[in-house]
Design a protein with these regions (language model features):
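Catalytic cores of DNA base-excision repair glycosylases
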Residues: 2-203
Length: 203
């Protein structure tokens, strides 16, 4: 685990990220807050590409909690069969759809606590939704960000929570909204787990 980089160095890193990609975007396809929530929940232990392949047809017929409930668990399961843990995920999506319909007026809540009260929604999923849909500077730490935080010293920590805290403490405020996307994309395409592409690295 690398030592925590100083503030000027972290600022310079994110300045470079911003220059290279001013408006980074998440790669999960969605059309509203509900489809984003479902896509992120389905993405655990799966690739974004795999989730997108399954959800294109799904979201064409079920892009709201009410429509998901009409679709039903059996049909949902068929749509997401190619995604890992699809049976458990289907049950969770149906449960969270019912809760959203009955307790939240069919709307996705904008608080972390409310999001995490939904079945199958942990802190990382809640943070992604808060960041991507509600534009809150939440840092969703996935395997890529955990690796980069520790490998580079941008946000070292022994746990996901520690890395998230380090990001919140050390990423300059003007970069906080997009920080998690820059780091995910950097980890996905450059600072990969095996044989990182160091000659192409902005850092």
């Amino acid at each position: 685990m690398a030592r925590q980089l100083d503030y000027p160095t972290v600022r310079e890193i994110f300045t470079r990220f911003q220059a290279a990609e001013p408006e980074p975007k998440g790669e999960l396809e969605h059309v509203n807050a509900f489809t984003l929530l479902v896509a992120v929940a389905l993405s655990a232990q799966a690739t974004d590409a795999g989730v997108n392949k399954a959800t294109r047809a799904l979201f064409a017929v079920a892009d709201s909690p009410a429509k998901m409930l009409v679709l039903g668990e059996e049909a949902l399961t068929e749509h997401i069969r190619t995604i890992g843990l699809f049976r458990t995920k289907a049950k969770n999506v149906m449960k969270l759809s019912r809760i959203l319909a009955e307790e939240f007026g069919g709307e996705v809540p904008s608080s972390r606590a409310a999001l995490q009260s939904l079945p199958g929604v942990g802190r990382k999923t809640a943070n992604v939704v808060l960041n991507m849909w509600f534009h809150y500077p939440a840092q969703a730490v996935d395997t890529h960000i955990f690796r980069i935080g520790n490998r580079t010293g941008i946000a070292p920590g022994k746990t996901v929570e520690a890395v998230e805290s380090a990001l919140e403490d050390h990423v300059p405020a003007e970069f906080a909204l997009h920080a998690h996307h820059w780091l995910i994309l950097h980890g996905r395409y450059t600072c990969v787990a095996r044989k990182p592409k160091c000659p192409a690295c902005l850092i």
